[in-house]
Regions:
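Thiol/selenol-based redox catalytic cores and closely related redox-interacting motifs
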Residues: 68, 72-117
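Short active-site oxyanion
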Residues: 28-29, 51-54, 84-87
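Bacterial N-terminal signal peptides
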Residues: 8-17
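Bacterial N-terminal signal peptides that target proteins for export
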Residues: 1-8
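Conserved helix-turn-beta segment immediately C-terminal to the redox Cys motif
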Residues: 44-64
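Stable alpha-helical elements in mature extracytoplasmic
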Residues: 36, 43, 58-61, 93-97
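Active-site-proximal beta-strand/loop segments in catalytic clefts of secreted hydrolases
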Residues: 32-34, 57-60, 91, 113-115
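Local sequence-structure signature of Cys/Sec-based thiol-disulfide redox active-site neighborhoods
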Residues: 22-50
Length: 117
């Protein structure tokens, strides 16, 4: 997988408050993915290996999920996740998600558009 993170996807807008990862407790994250995508499972494994408690839901209508999440065209990828009020799109590294949660900026979330190489 190519490691060029386009995590400038701190998409401005909806101000949500978050709770930082505390006391080693696993942070819950809900991932929506296409049932036919193979790389989504690898990303879910990455999240679990980095302390996240992942719930995964297969969806045949990812376009609707992305639209309801308010994703800007061009920032989409193969899966969409929700964690503590933030939208996580694509193969965002777990450390970047943890930083987002710890710093709790007024943002929609993080995005790594496109598919991994």
């Amino acid at each position: 997988m190519r490691k060029h993170t386009l995590a400038l996807g701190l998409m401005a807008a909806l101000g949500f408050s978050t709770t930082a990862l505390a006391g080693g407790a696993a942070q819950s994250i809900h991932v929506y993915k296409s049932p036919t995508c193979g790389c989504c499972g690898d990303w879910i494994d990455h999240l679990e290996e980095n302390g996240f408690d992942v719930t995964a839901t297969n969806s045949d209508d990812m376009g609707r999920i992305k639209a309801e999440a308010g994703l800007i065209p061009g920032l989409g990828s193969c899966h969409t996740a929700f964690v503590d009020g933030y939208v996580i799109e694509g193969h965002v590294p777990a450390d970047d998600i943890k930083r987002l949660l710890a710093e709790a900026p007024k943002a929609t979330g993080l995005s790594v558009p496109g598919m991994p190489a």
